[in-house]
């Protein structure tokens, strides 16, 4: 089970990949009648394959099911990872919404 205490801001149990830096100014988080909506951003110099491999390995240990390469489902929530290359880095957008 994941033992790091570093989690993405706004998520109680979404670990931040080692070497990844959060971009907190862009984060949003609010509750709706159907559930919570959270968006957070982070930047890393790791490649897309390593990022996806990390989260496909870690998230199932936290109860998430892999739905697609960048989509995970748990209970009534969907977590999407949107990865964008930007020069030498990859920007990862973590989006959580009700199913």
Where would I find each of the regions flagged by the language model?
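An acidic-aromatic pocket/loop used at catalytic or ligand-binding sites
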Residues: 2-99
